[in-house]
């Protein structure tokens, strides 16, 4: 055997590891190495859950306003429905008597305000649902629709009754209608109070509509 060839290493005997090492020395990527693992960032903060805090406050305000609207609507209906006056000077055959059901408009006033108050009472469970679930859209939208109908009903009844009350107080020279409130003072005062309370119910309903609109607004 030639001693000069002892230091020679055959090319076929070169291991793949040595070739990879030589490639690394030249700045090239290693063939068999796996890519470094991606860094994962773990957040320790808990994701905030949607609680709808301000909407819950609006729902509580809605419930309070609804109670006020119920009291005003039912109060207006009761005031008008119990309003009557008999003048003290009368005989057995002649009486001067004024009663709410003598006027068809006042009958309509009593019925419409009572209906509005009844619908408002029926809407209380939905208002409670909106307090428990302030993010629910369905109950809130249904409340908005019913409040719009009730507002239109109450305003129509109060406006029609206000026209009759005005004629009762001032009369009409063109139609030769005399003012009766100079004689039936208590009756006219009762009708005026009922009309004012009915308009208060309408104001409550307007506030309820604004509250429902704000509650339906997305944040």
Swiss-Prot record:
Record region (Disordered): 1-43
Sugar attachment sites: 170
Cytoplasmic compartment residues: 1-57, 130-147, 215-219
Keywords of this entry: Cell membrane, Cell wall biogenesis/degradation, Glycoprotein, Membrane, Transmembrane, Transmembrane helix
Protein name, UniProt field: Casparian strip membrane protein 3
Subunit composition and interactions: Homodimer and heterodimers.
Main location as per UniProt: membrane
Pfam families, per the entry: CASP_dom (PF04535)
Family the UniProt entry places it in: Belongs to the Casparian strip membrane proteins (CASP) family.
Extracellular compartment spans: 79-108, 169-193
Organism for this UniProt entry: Lotus japonicus
Record membrane topology: Multi-pass membrane protein
InterPro entries: CASP/CASPL, CASP_dom, CASPL
Keyword Nucleus among record annotations: no
């Amino acid at each position: 055997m030639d001693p000069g060839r002892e230091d020679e290493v055959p090319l076929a005997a070169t291991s793949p590891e040595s070739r990879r090492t030589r490639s690394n020395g030249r700045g090239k990527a290693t063939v068999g190495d796996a890519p470094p693992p991606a860094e994962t960032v773990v957040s320790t903060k808990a994701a905030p859950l949607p609680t709808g805090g301000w909407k819950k406050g609006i729902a509580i305000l809605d419930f309070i306003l609804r109670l006020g609207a119920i009291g005003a609507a039912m109060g207006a209906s009761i005031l008008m429905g119990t309003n009557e006056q008999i003048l003290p000077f009368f005989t057995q055959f002649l009486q001067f008597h004024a009663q709410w059901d003598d006027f068809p408009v006042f009958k309509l006033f009593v019925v419409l305000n009572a209906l509005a108050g009844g619908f408002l009472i029926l809407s209380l469970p939905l208002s409670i649902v909106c307090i428990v679930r302030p993010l629910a859209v369905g109950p809130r939208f249904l409340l908005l629709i019913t409040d719009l109908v009730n507002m239109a009903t109450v305003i129509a009844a109060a406006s029609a009754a206000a026209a009759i009350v005005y004629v009762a107080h001032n009369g009409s020279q063109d139609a030769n209608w005399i003012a009766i409130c100079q004689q039936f003072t208590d009756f006219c005062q009762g009708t005026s109070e009922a009309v004012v309370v009915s308009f208060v119910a309408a104001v409550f309903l307007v506030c309820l509509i604004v509250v429902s609109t704000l509650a339906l607004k997305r944040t």
